[in-house]
Amino acid sequence: MKNIISLVSKKKAASKNEDKNISESSRDIVNQQEVFNTEDFEEGKKDSAFELDHLEFTTNSAQLGDSDEDNENVINEMNATDDANEANSEEKSMTLKQALLKYPKAALWSILVSTTLVMEGYDTALLSALYALPVFQRKFGTLNGEGSYEITSQWQIGLNMCVLCGEMIGLQITTYMVEFMGNRYTMITALGLLTAYIFILYYCKSLAMIAVGQILSAIPWGCFQSLAVTYASEVCPLALRYYMTSYSNICWLFGQIFASGIMKNSQENLGNSDLGYKLPFALQWIWPAPLMIGIFFAPESPWWLVRKDRVAEARKSLSRILSGKGAEKDIQVDLTLKQIELTIEKERLLASKSGSFFNCFKGVNGRRTRLACLTWVAQNSSGAVLLGYSTYFFERAGMATDKAFTFSLIQYCLGLAGTLCSWVISGRVGRWTILTYGLAFQMVCLFIIGGMGFGSGSSASNGAGGLLLALSFFYNAGIGAVVYCIVAEIPSAELRTKTIVLARICYNLMAVINAILTPYMLNVSDWNWGAKTGLYWGGFTAVTLAWVIIDLPETTGRTFSEINELFNQGVPARKFASTVVDPFGKGKTQHDSLADESISQSSSIKQRELNAADKC
């Protein structure tokens, strides 16, 4: 903060003698050029070594001219760059404690918006658990070869496909709604629609009605999937980003724990009543109304407002997000706003300000889109599907129904513990490390589960169940939590929402494959693999781990501006952590840049001479 106050003091002093300072600054900068050799400079110009451009972000320098007005504009741009650098440095050096003291409201607003994902986690776990509920099986199922009722594989696939297709429709609609009305009103609209769609599920008379209710309810869920992560990443500083984006995973787990507890109660107390499946559907009405009220009062993302050229509103939004008061708060708001403006302006210069889906696949953005998509696909290609079918899996592994529901509840609680564990270790190791080690442990668990499928008796089924609990812990301590942060950090600011939408669509496409295959793997009347399913997913996890090691960069400790620069420079994945970048430059004039270039060339020549002398 001392740096901020010092910076503002300097600006105030400069503003009192503005015209005089501009002229003096011009003369001082020109005088400084005597430090480097004019002949080298002229020769460099001939060789096009020093190409003079006007003030652009691609040069990190500005050209001083003969006009005082032009020089004033140049120096204003230099000051803006200094402001952005100051904000970037402040964000990087901020500790978790400092971030919580300075941005407590940002954290709370982020938590509120992400809580919408509780409903999706709840319904995802609910639908899978209903397949194992006796009253639901008798009401909507058919007799199998063993003389018991079950929901056929075809209907399980169909219902799951309805959810995934609805989510993909919702994701596509979300991108256009956000462009038109912003994050807040898009989420409020989605919550209102969800409230109406729940009626279809509550009054369902057939699996076809459930299918209609699921596909319609999934449209708002698609909105929540993309906007919760986007909002959290844009309102919170670097020190809070991992915690607030991975909180999305905690919301999923809260929903799944809630669903498991309700389904356990239904199995024990409402096993022969239609309320056994109606009550779980009805409880979804708890969430929308309070969330709609809370989100209405939430500030809009300042990044979205700047992208829409609504800078004054972005300033107000930042003022609501930041704590403090008086001049100190105003200074911090100005610096942060300038950082956002310059980051977005630089992206627009590089991408010709085109924000279409096609731009997500062009040039540097193509790499960023690929990484975001494959990172989210990795959640579905590493055996996580078994966690969604845990109750059904436990039954097919030989457990009694009541014990299977108990194990599922324990599984989700362990998943919550795993996510909290990832919060602890994220302060010590990077995102990439958390992801790779998490996948490695998952792979081991899955292969052992698959091996136990060749055994028989209660010991084998209990062992497989215990390892599925361990799988839940490692999944949520690793890829389950960290993916939300990585997917939010990888895209550019201009294309963040669209890239996250594309990534989530890819996630859902992989989930479609899982939804088709998994019921066949587990159902007695089909492939009946049981615990052997672990071998299949262990192999997929190994492939996923290999891709992460080779292609996924480390973004820990990087601001959005620095991540942009790393991608623009084409830095290889394994060099992201060690590469030093200067996203905004240092507010230099072109003369400063030429001097630096000359000094750099001179140093390079001297180094070559020393190397030649050493060889001799």
From Swiss-Prot:
Residues 1-115, 172-186, 230-242, 300-370, 426-433, 488-499, 554-616 are cytoplasmic. Its main location: membrane. It is found in: Cell membrane. The chain crosses the membrane at residues 116-136, 151-171, 187-207, 209-229, 243-263, 279-299, 371-391, 405-425, 434-454, 467-487, 500-520, 533-553. It is a multi-pass membrane protein. One of its GO terms (biological process) is maltose transport. Belongs to the major facilitator superfamily. Sugar transporter (TC 2.A.1.1) family. This is General alpha-glucoside permease.
